[in-house]
């Protein structure tokens, strides 16, 4: 009997080469749900997706054996969702990923020891980057084990407060290929350890020494590094004029210097620090104690090619700002946030020299008026970012100029300003606008918002916090015109109803939804967003009394990317809270003053949410929950925040704003 030949029927995708499929995967990789759909299409796609993926961010360390068995080409492993990573878990990583792994992030993980790190270092011989920030129990013995990872190029040890010079010395000797090192808040490390690092690791390009008890002594060695590009000295109180007096260097490679919060540094010390940094591009002097005067600005003579300067919280004089504009006229970014002494005269003399300015931050510069805004608009046509929160003396007419003259704006913060609908009409001409903050803008209405909806189709972020003139009509125009919206804040816009939520459900890319203090929204509106906005990651429903279990059940079923939720002061019971356990990536939950909750229901919900990192609960529950449960959850990586606030009547927004202004300096 003849055997019948089986004819293999080729499917269309069988003709695609592996390289072409990988290109397709690169294009859809930003959306995890698309990748999942692709891999579930057929066996060959499942295998190709497994072979292609190089970056993983698992929700729990328990999943590591299964995940790493499937994805054998993993090069970047991010375990920040895993608060508890044991030595066994690190052993699994070493055995299954081995020579393939190049980057590992343990910055929010604990429970591992030197033994686990040693297995990792010996197995992952090509590891070039590891983040061990927040390992507050890490000691010198652990650092000696890290030194076994000879291929390391980037190492972060922020807040490893038990480390000393000895541990850093071990790393310096063992990891000579290091080019990026962060020791921020490693308060046990001083001049000796930093000096050893500079002597042994000649390839260092980025060095973060913020809040270390160092002096200018170790800077002599650091500034000899031929490839050093970024040096961060934030909060280094030991770096003062005396310790820098004899400093002489020629660090032509240095491009960024952060000397913010160096309280003992004046223009004399800064002159020494900048003496050989002729190619410096970015300088941060925020919260320095010295007045930014003509003398201080003169220290910038050697860095005339500077492109960015931050003077947040500093006391500045008009002469100082004028000198900065004259000496550094190539500046593209200037930040004067909370510089309360900035005046129209000073700012105008600065910006009129900066024709290339792209970013300007004048947040809380309360002395500025229309004069400054006029000068900014006329002098800086290339501006892409303008932050001017709480510039309350700026009149309504000035905002019209911003829209007419600064058409390239992408980011605009007008929180707590006098802008009105005519101002919004002008700003709608900024077609590239992606972030617009209009919180506490009491003069705007739906009419003004409709201009934004029709003109700014690229809008990604919109903040309407306490802008009480906004209703469903305005939100509807935004939802229709700004379909790429990712973040919206409508908190305390009390006329908002479910109609707005139904409109916003058309914005399928929505990730952050804040509606705190909106009494007229219900679970029906929330369900509409949950069903259609699959990327939803953060939801704030505090003080929304009509939100109940039905809304949470919808979120639990449809919003599988939800990471943070606040349901304080709502009608939610333990039924809705328990349903949240169905969301595998939920990390933060806040539930305070919800009378429908029983301690047993809260306990069950907390146990069910296995990836929980932070829980904000009412203080009364602390004595009602079993102590063993609290200890168990803390061991699992969950931190508790107990709140004892009582319900307060909401203030009228105008009265609330008046109180805020009276508190301001």
UniProtKB/Swiss-Prot annotation:
BP GO annotations: protein ubiquitination; ubiquitin-dependent protein catabolic process
SMART domains: LRR_CC
One Pfam family, short name: LRR_6
Ranges occupied by LRR repeats: 61-81, 82-108, 109-134, 135-159, 160-185, 186-211, 214-235, 236-261, 262-287, 288-312, 313-338, 339-364, 365-390, 391-416, 419-440, 441-466, 467-492, 493-517, 518-543, 544-569, 594-619
Cellular component, GO annotation: nucleus; SCF ubiquitin ligase complex
Cleavable signal peptide: none
The keyword Repeat is assigned to this record: yes
Domain F-box: 11-60
Alphabetized InterPro entries for the sequence: Leu-rich_rpt, Leu-rich_rpt_Cys-con_subtyp, LRR_dom_sf
Keywords: Leucine-rich repeat, Repeat
Name of the featured protein: F-box/LRR-repeat protein 3
Gene (UniProt): FBL3
């Amino acid at each position: 009997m003849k055997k019948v030949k089986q004819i293999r029927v080729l499917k269309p995708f069988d003709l695609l080469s592996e390289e072409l499929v990988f290109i397709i995967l690169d294009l859809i990789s930003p959306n995890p749900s698309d990748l999942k759909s692709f891999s579930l299409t057929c066996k060959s796609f499942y295998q190709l997706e497994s072979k292609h993926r190089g970056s993983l961010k698992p929700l729990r360390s328990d999943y590591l054996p299964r995940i790493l068995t499937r994805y054998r080409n993993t090069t970047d492993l991010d375990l920040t969702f895993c608060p508890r990573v044991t030595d066994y878990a690190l052993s699994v990583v070493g055995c299954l990923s081995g020579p393939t792994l190049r980057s590992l992030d343990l910055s929010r993980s604990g429970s591992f020891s030197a033994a686990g790190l040693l297995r990792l270092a010996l197995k992952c011989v090509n590891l070039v980057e590891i983040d061990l920030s927040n390992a507050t129990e890490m000691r010198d013995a652990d650092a000696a084990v890290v030194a076994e990872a000879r291929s390391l190029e980037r190492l972060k040890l922020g807040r490893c407060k038990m480390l000393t010079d000895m541990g850093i010395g071990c790393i310096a000797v063992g990891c000579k290929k290091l080019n990026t090192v962060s020791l921020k808040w490693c308060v046990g490390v001083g001049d000796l350890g930093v000096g050893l690092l500079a002597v042994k690791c000649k390839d260092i390009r980025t060095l973060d020494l913020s809040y270390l008890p160092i002096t200018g002594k170790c800077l002599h060695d650091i500034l000899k590094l031929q490839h050093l590009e970024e040096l961060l000295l934030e909060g280094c109180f030991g770096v003062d004029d005396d310790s820098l007096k004899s400093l002489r260097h020629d660090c032509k490679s240095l491009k960024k210097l952060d000397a913010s919060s160096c309280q003992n540094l004046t223009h004399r010390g800064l002159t020494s620090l900048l003496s050989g940094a002729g190619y410096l591009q970015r300088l941060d002097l925020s919260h320095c104690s010295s007045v930014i005067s003509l003398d201080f600005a003169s220290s910038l003579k050697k860095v005339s090619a500077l492109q960015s300067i931050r003077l947040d919280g500093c006391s500045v004089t008009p002469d100082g700002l004028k000198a900065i504009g004259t000496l550094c006229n190539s500046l593209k970014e200037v930040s004067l946030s909370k510089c309360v002494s900035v005046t129209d005269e000073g700012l105008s003399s600065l910006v009129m020299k900066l024709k290339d300015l792209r970013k300007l931050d004048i947040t809380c510069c309360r002395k500025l008026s229309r004069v400054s805004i006029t000068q900014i608009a006329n002098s800086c046509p290339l501006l892409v970012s303008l932050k001017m929160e709480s510039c309350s003396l700026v009149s309504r007419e000035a905002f019209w100029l911003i829209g007419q003259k600064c058409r390239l704006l992408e980011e605009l913060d007008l929180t707590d300003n006098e802008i009105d609908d005519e101002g919004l009409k002008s700003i709608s001409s900024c077609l590239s606008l992606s972030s617009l903050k209009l919180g506490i803008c009491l003069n705007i209405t739906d009419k003004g918002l409709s201009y934004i909806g029709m003109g700014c189709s690229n809008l990604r972020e919109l903040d309407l916090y306490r802008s009480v003139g906004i209703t469903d009509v305005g939100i509807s125009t935004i939802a229709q015109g700004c379909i790429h919206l990712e973040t919206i804040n409508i908190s305390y816009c009390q006329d908002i109803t479910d109609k707005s939520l139904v409109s916003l459900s058309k914005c399928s890319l929505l990730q952050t939804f804040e509606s705190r203090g909106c009494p007229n929204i219900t679970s029906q509106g929330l369900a509409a967003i949950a069903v259609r906005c699959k990327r939803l990651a953060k939801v704030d429903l505090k003080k929304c009394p009509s939100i109940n279990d039905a809304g949470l059940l919808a979120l639990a079923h449809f919003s599988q990317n939800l990471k943070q939720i606040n349901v304080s002061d709502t009608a939610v019971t333990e039924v809705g809270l328990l349903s949240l356990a169905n969301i595998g990536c939920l990390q933060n939950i806040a539930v305070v003053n919800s009378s429908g909750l029983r301690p047993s229901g809260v306990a069950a919900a907390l146990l069910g949410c296995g990836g929980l990192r932070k829980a904000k609960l009412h203080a009364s529950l602390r004595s009602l929950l079993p102590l063993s449960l609290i200890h168990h959850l803390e061991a699992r990586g969950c931190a508790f925040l107990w709140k004892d606030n009582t319900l307060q009547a909401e203030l009228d927004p105008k009265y609330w704003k008046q109180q805020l202004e009276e508190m301001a300096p």
